[in-house]
């Protein structure tokens, strides 16, 4: 016997419970999220609070639970701090405080803040209740003022008045304590004698069923219902039979059925007891487990009928109590139990065989009842004519045919009760199914009238039941047939696809609930044939709740009618997610009943109840709106949703209302689900004024530009050292190089000075740039006068090159190794930093109707994160490569130390004595004191000095060029590139020098010449000298200095050989300094001090 189970999913009824409890006192309360430590935002506010404070619900949502928006000038600051402290410590607070309404009117409020815990004991919500006590406060204040006036009139009684006022204050205080004590006692009593806590927990509450509560859909209850059904049929058969055929004439015959009758009465009494403990399904479809509600429901429905039907009349026969025939008539009240059968008939109608069986049973039962009536009519006719010799009744005819006629004034004899009942049942059945055969016929007027009624009922029953049983089932139970058909299809689908039990339960509950709501009627299918005018009026009536919102007050009736056609009804079960974070929003939802919660990262952002609107602020041009949170049902929720696609169509037809709708929906939404809503606001504020992007420094004369990803508008200038560290090789065009060669030295040095003062120095060698790729070198390359720079979100800028023609790029630059015999002339290219100017980024302002503001902002943030990640990976890789190189050099030095003889460690220290910058002459002079013999390099020459070394240098900080070996502080400055100007052989020949500091130690970086027969070209050598560098006391150094002939061809200069036998056995790295010269043709020279400074032994001649 299938039974509608009802809605059994566990629900979170916290909001309903709180609202129900506050209806008895005051319904002014708010709920705040206790898991967000910053501000504790409000997630729900009652209608009473909105009326009390004068704020709309949308204005209160997401504000702080401390109610700072209600504070005013007379609000006690100490109470403010206590409220904040109680929220931080998550403890209860209660006090009287003055608040201010939205219109500025003050009112005294009794504020009570209580923390709400979940099933784990964690505080997840704050419940703040507000009670207006302004009248009480005003009354007390007016009494005090009256006393003050009386005090002013008679000072003699001032002492008495003050004492009285003081005593009244004490009594008031004591009465308050007594009230609190009484409340505490009530709380204690409630906690002791009541199962419910003082405040409900915010959790999904399972149905708490007592073990003495019987489920109405359980197997035992189904079997018991079948037993009661059989007992009901027994009563329907035996009661009319006993009343009509037996009466009180034959008690011995009556006693034979007394046992079964008593058993049936006992069953009915037990059924009454079980009904008081059996669950039932409410009108809303929920299963009721509460014993009190079950008792009330049963008493007000079927209890009276069941009680009368269960009266133990047959116990009177069991105790030999003489009864009159009226008692037998009272037993017919038990036939009211058949009404319970009609109530449950829909449960038995899922199978056609059961329906047919029930119909046949009802037909036979009707024939049985009519047979009893037919016998009573014949009996009464015989008794009324007992004094006459009248023998025309059907009982007389039956007695004659059976040879048992009546005699003794028709009081004795006659057919037996058994024969009479069979004959009566035969007559009624033949009359119901046909017109009869005449062997048992009606002779008297009463019998004929009854026969006529029987024939009419028979014709109706025959036409309804036997004529077309299938049509009867289809007409009467077509809806249920469809229900069971769909249920069977659903179960088959679940069985075929092996769906899990949880998903199966959800599908069945959703189907049953939606069916109970609309009874299987598809409103769209039903209304599609109606004209649009009538269909619009019908849908407006069906959706009148959502159309009565203030959002649609300005809409015309035509607009509302068009909009009502796009409103759908939806249903959500407890625990079901209406929307997931990141889903495309398809509709705007209005909560008709139930409660829901908005979740993000398992935190409650808002609680939605009846009358709340949830969706997103719209724009006419919106295509896709992504949700920023989850929406989950706490209870069974009925929703009405406006499909966005249809909404945009309607707004397109009514443009005069569209703008108003877009503005108003932002204020009417209880919670805005638009993804990036907060970011959209920030981006609009930041894009009101477009900040032009700073022009980063480049490294060459570039006409064309490559497309780029630039930094944000707020980024600062990018230094050239950072730019060049990201590029492996920098070149310059031949035309630009030629113009620089033919220019005057003053203009060239002026340009260089301008670049130095602006913080940029162009590199004249691609190898030097590649050597600065290490993180340490990059850090040291920053000039000290620029200080620290903020971290920037870099974006890759691709610029286009613009030259007179395609430059020849040497493919040998790829690996940095060149054949020593090659003397091929190649072009070099220089990119001037003053030529690079990225186009300023123009960020279009985002208007309020701009649809892509949030999307573009998020895309920009993602791009920044990706570029930052890529930059960090490149930096990490560079550091690893640099560390690997250092490790290799350390291993080489260790091997040399092991293989070479140990020598005492000494060093050649350099001390700067003076520096005299002069921008007019573009030259300064620096003198170095060498306590020990040192090697000094000048253009086209190198000399070994035992005393002072003097060279020309300009625009260089002396602390970056040399250092005292005795100083202990570490220098964190980056590598410094400077121009050395010498003129021993070539006029205005600029040299190139780089001094790199590592703490307070120094090491040199050398660059090999571009083309040479002995030194490896295009190779950067870091000559880091340590102990036992020189393997022998006699070492000769060969330098090959290229020079420029008059014809412009490149030739090799003189080879200078210097003996280093007077040098100490080893040079300490601290005192090592060197300079590499670069003639006008940009061919650097290199200083080599020992074989340990080069990786290729063929590079020098020892």
Swiss-Prot record:
Keywords from the UniProt entry = Glycoprotein, Ion channel, Ion transport, Membrane, Potassium, Potassium channel, Potassium transport, Transmembrane, Transmembrane helix, Transport, Voltage-gated channel
Membrane-traversing stretches: 226-246, 256-276, 299-319, 328-348, 354-374, 449-469
Catalysed reactions, as listed in the record = K(+)(in) = K(+)(out)
Q: Which residues are glycosylated?
A: 320, 409
Cytoplasmic-facing ranges:
1-225, 277-298, 349-353, 470-1102
Q: Which residues lie on this side of the membrane: Extracellular?
A: 247-255, 320-327, 375-419, 441-448
- Intramembrane residues span 420-440
Q: What name is this protein filed under?
A: Voltage-gated delayed rectifier potassium channel KCNH8
Enumerate the CDD domains for this protein: CAP_ED, PAS
Cross-referenced InterPro entries: cNMP-bd_dom, cNMP-bd_dom_sf, Ion_trans_dom, K_chnl_volt-dep_EAG/ELK/ERG, K_chnl_volt-dep_ELK, KCNH_animal-type, PAC, PAS
Which domain of life does this protein belong to?
Eukaryota
